[in-house]
């Protein structure tokens, strides 16, 4: 670390400490004032976990809402003094909308206002400083521009407000036809809403009118042409963008994409604009083909989470996909290599605008239900859809007590107290630059179909927004622990104390190094019987392109992080040691033995919210503990925005199908679900399905140890991580081995059972308490 970097880090740390202390003091004072006001008036603070019908319910959230609205107003305001009156009128309307349920003439609210403003600003400042620490000063300004863009634009484009925005820009250009910047923004708005031909026209005109934006405008025109299928025009536009600015890395990437569409790469591309790819060509025996259309899984949507589970309990795995711009999709396995879309008749289609989802049999009925996080950044109600056992689902969100309002990205089922009933955890983020952090939710299963949020009581308290999380028993004490993958900054590890409470042990575990990340999972990557942690990091597009061109991350980049469990309560970062050295925009990922050689591989679903942010999904093949990128060698050409990544033996033939739900944040950026199947079974295997009796029915949290050929393999039944959940059925690759020496099952309640003489190339079902399998 350079001297300048050292001083920057020290300054950031000191500022963080100061802001944290100031924020704590302000929050304490605010709490005291609120208690005093409640004592005088007899009116408690409003409940902020329920969805506001037509505006924020209290002063804190009203102030944050107004700050977010103001940021959007100034973000979209044309760069002209003549636009100021309209902006001021919009600000006045924003005050009315944000403070609809808050009477600022009330002395109590007036007294609270300065402290509410102070706590909002200290929260935002603390997050900003954490971002500098995580991202680094060289990339921070670019990241801030990115954050301002997505938080300003998402609320507009997820609603019909974008129509008003487009009309306002069009009216402005009638009177100001030479305003190339507004014309560029109009073209970008057309791209985001799927009006690609109009977008290309406006962006090309903007590029011709202002040399300062020529490269950026021509690049986005190239993206619009690409989506139109006009690949030659896309090539010309991206070449023009690079002529204007040879450092425009996204333009070089899209030129690479477009030229391949017409078979002209690299020779039809000027030499100075070519992009040599130095990664993804590692040696592998895997050869994939996309079977989504043939299997009936090729639905076009804004795909997010994927849950693979047996919803009708017929022994075959089915698929559910959460869609950001539509209803949830459910596909029934026909047992013949195809699926039938049963979304509407099952009722699950009404679970709209889903992001994260998880399947779990919370009432131990034998039929797993679905929990869905809705709307992500935009904020929505958590939903619980009970499986009725007859092919249909019923929304029981309100009556079960889980219907709370949050900007939630991921959820999971876990039996954290090992009482045989699945509990539900919901991980929350932010819905705007100035949003207040909503506490994560740990819903304890009361055993009567209802849940109680015990997160604060249990000690799971975090002031940081998180996108992903994972549960796993890292210290082998029989109780699942929680890892939070905080979006910007340090992750957090909460150790389960076994008494219903948790203790944060991040620093002492050696996990307090900051990064920018989406999701995570516990996985025994080295099969030593101790769970390791994979944290899927997210990089800006330029760093991804650098990795593609150089085969490694830039000096300031963050590769996928693998933390090895040291078996003493601590972890060590070993990514570079095991060959994981590239930056990707990983929004999802999973580990599974794709080539059946007995070693877990890693699949990354990559991309980003912006329309021009697309990149390949990545396969990192594990060769006896060393990983290599085999993406292109294996025939995985998919470029897009990979959210839910899942690996499952859908056809019970030993081939793990790689499922990828893709789609962007904007309504014009949809794509089609992919399902990549190996051309042939790569090796022998054993599939194991567990049924709990005293443990939860789906055996979530169970650990399995298989011994074959002189080595161990370890698996854990997961109740959800990333944007979705892996199947409860566990897959063991055996290579050329034809015998299994033994299989041990460690049930969540502590019982251990051992089985011998198991067959290969088949699925076995083990019921807790039984001395045999079938």
Predicted features and spans:
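Short, conserved, GDST-rich strand-edge loop motifs in beta-rich repeat architectures
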Residues: 427-435, 537-555, 605-612
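Repeat-based blade/solenoid architectures
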Residues: 296-306, 347-358, 401-412, 459-470, ...
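Gly/Ser/Thr/Pro-enriched helix-cap/hinge segments flanking short amphipathic alpha-helices
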Residues: 237, 626, 632-774
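Calcium-coordinating acidic loop motifs
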Residues: 310-312, 316, 334-335, 361-363, ...
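Hydrophobic beta-strand segments that make up the repeating blades of beta-propeller
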Residues: 319-323, 370-375, 424-428, 482-486, ...
